[in-house]
Every structure is written in structure tokens, then in C-alpha cells.
């Protein structure tokens, strides 16, 4: 298992893996549907799906608003190539969301599981709101994983799996992983309420039931774990994975039916401007 993971190093460092990401497509789609259900009925003229990935949300947006101009934006060539295979009318744009600006103002900015990768939401979200038309809407959901058991275990393994219990990776890596990008719900309210006409903020915890030999790790490795496995050298990765998999198996035992329970929290925001 560990040797197979080490052979995947190049992909983990440089590329997103669409097939691995789609392994849990149904579970990844659930928060998209929940977010869509909270958007007031409207007829958006121009929609941008930020961090569109393989197009899970883009396809649902196309079904709901088939007459809208639809754009999928992502930084990964591999993800965009996969999304472009969808039988929908959409344009695809490669861009880094840290610097991205809409060519024309958006009726709807839809951001599914992407903003948590970006820091300084105090500046980011007002900047995104500034790219909306009057009456436009920013709708986002973000994994709130900073306090999740699997995330704390990842930090524990990184901090103690080195020789003699030493830490692994650079101080800069550990700093990035300890940093909180996702704010508390009340702080999002204080940030966005003065800027919007309507604001809905909530949090949902899903009890995800997953299958496989290492389903928790399979979920994590395609997203949250990429910075760790991409930075560590081969020996450090071996030490980290040995320790981390041990901790995951201990904390997330299989149920009697052979499946694994994987609680997962997400923050949702629907912020609309006045007309």
C-alpha cells in the first residue's frame, strides 16, 4: 500500500487526479445539491463555476439554468479536460482563483469546495462580491475540516513521525496546514452582512458512509493531503504514511457491515446583492 502511494508521487505533486476525485462523486455532489436548493429562483444571465474540477457542479448548474452563459474555472488542466467531456454547453477557463477576475460581471458565482484552499477570506469574499451584477449572488460551500479527526491525525503524524519523534516537512508546510482559512459562521456574518441585501449562512455535518480498504485516506489523498505528499521526500513520505494510516485505521474502524463512517462538516454561504 505505502509503496503504491510512493509511486504516485509525481501525480500528487503536480496534478489533480480526476478519476480518483470522482471515486466519491455521489457524496461530493450532495453539498452541491444542498447549496442549489438555497438559491432563490431566478434566471441568471451569466454563471461562473469557480473551482469547477470535473464539472460535478457545472453539470447541475447547466440543468437548472440551461439558457445561462456558463463558465467553468479551474487551475488544473486535467480537471478541465475531464469537465470538457460533459454533454453540456459551457466554456472552460484555466485560472488561479487567487488572482482571477470575471471578464464580465456575473449573475451567479458558484464556488463548490474551493474557497477553503484560499487564504484571507476577509479580502477574498468582498472581492468576489465586487464581480457580481446588481442582484447577483455568491453561493459557496467549503469543507470545515480544520477540527476534523482525520485532519488532526494528519498534523499529529507530520509533527511526530520523523526519526526519534521529530517533525517532518518544512516549518512553512506545517504553518500552512495549521492555518485556518475557513472562518467561523459569526465572522462570515460580520464580514458579509454589511455588503449584501440577503445573507444565508449555515453548517451541515454529513455522516458519510464509505467503502474500501482505506476509504478515508482515498478521500483525503486527492485534495487535503496533496501538499504534504508533494513536499516530503521518499523516506519522509514513507514514515508519514506508515504513521498516518495506522492512526486512521485506529480512529476510523470498519463497521460490522464492512463499511466506514466518515463524518464531514461543510460551511454554506448564499450572499445576494441588492438590485
Swiss-Prot record:
Q: Which family does it belong to?
A: Belongs to the methyltransferase superfamily. Tam family.
One GO molecular-function annotation for this sequence? trans-aconitate 2-methyltransferase activity
Give any Gene Ontology cellular component: cytoplasm
What name has this protein been given in UniProt?
Answer: Trans-aconitate 2-methyltransferase
A single BP term in Gene Ontology: methylation
Describe the function of this protein. Catalyzes the S-adenosylmethionine monomethyl esterification of trans-aconitate.
Instruction: Output the InterPro entries linked to this UniProt entry.
Output: Methyltransf_25 (IPR041698), SAM-dependent_MTases_sf (IPR029063), Trans-aconitate_MeTrfase (IPR023506), Trans_acon_MeTrfase_C (IPR023149)
> Which PANTHER family does this entry report, sorted A to Z?
TRANS-ACONITATE 2-METHYLTRANSFERASE (PTHR43861:SF1), TRANS-ACONITATE 2-METHYLTRANSFERASE-RELATED (PTHR43861)
One Pfam entry for this protein is Methyltransf_25
Q: Which CDD domains match?
A: AdoMet_MTases
Q: What keyword terms does UniProt attach to this protein?
A: Cytoplasm, Methyltransferase, S-adenosyl-L-methionine, Transferase
**Which Cys pairs are S-S linked?**
none
Which reactions is this enzyme annotated as catalysing? trans-aconitate + S-adenosyl-L-methionine = (E)-3-(methoxycarbonyl)pent-2-enedioate + S-adenosyl-L-homocysteine
Q: What is its EC number?
A: 2.1.1.144
Amino acid at each position: 500500500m505505502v509503496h503504491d502511494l510512493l509511486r504516485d508521487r509525481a501525480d500528487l505533486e503536480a496534478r489533480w487526479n480526476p478519476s480518483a476525485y470522482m471515486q466519491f462523486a455521489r457524496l461530493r455532489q450532495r453539498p452541491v445539491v444542498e447549496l442549489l436548493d438555497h438559491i432563490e429562483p431566478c434566471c441568471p444571465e451569466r454563471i461562473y463555476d469557480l473551482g469547477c474540477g470535473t464539472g460535478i457542479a457545472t453539470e447541475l448548474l447547466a440543468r437548472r439554468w440551461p439558457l445561462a452563459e456558463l463558465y467553468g474555472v479551474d487551475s488544473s488542466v486535467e480537471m478541465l479536460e475531464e469537465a470538457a467531456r460533459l454533454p453540456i454547453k459551457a466554456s472552460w477557463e484555466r485560472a488561479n482563483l487567487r488572482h482571477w477576475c470575471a471578464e464580465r460581471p456575473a449573475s451567479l458565482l458558484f464556488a463548490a469546495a474551493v474557497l477553503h484552499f484560499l487564504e484571507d477570506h476577509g479580502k477574498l469574499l468582498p472581492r468576489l462580491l465586487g464581480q457580481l451584477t446588481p442582484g447577483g449572488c455568491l453561493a459557496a460551500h467549503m469543507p470545515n475540516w480544520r477540527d476534523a479527526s482525520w485532519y488532526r491525525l494528519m498534523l499529529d503524524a507530520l509533527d511526530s513521525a520523523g526519526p526519534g519523534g521529530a517533525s517532518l516537512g518544512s516549518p512553512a508546510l506545517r504553518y500552512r496546514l495549521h492555518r485556518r482559512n475557513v472562518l467561523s459562521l459569526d465572522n462570515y456574518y460580520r464580514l458579509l452582512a454589511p455588503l449584501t441585501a440577503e445573507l444565508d449562512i449555515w453548517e451541515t455535518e454529513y455522516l458519510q458512509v464509505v467503502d474500501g480498504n482505506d476509504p478515508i485516506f482515498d478521500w483525503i489523498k486527492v485534495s487535503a493531503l496533496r501538499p504534504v505528499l508533494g513536499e516530503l521526500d521518499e523516506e519522509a513520505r514513507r514514515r508519514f504514511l506508515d504513521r498516518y494510516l495506522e492512526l486512521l485505521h485506529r480512529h476510523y474502524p470498519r463497521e460490522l457491515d464492512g463499511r466506514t463512517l466518515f463524518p464531514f462538516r461543510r460551511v454554506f454561504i448564499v450572499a445576494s446583492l441588492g438590485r
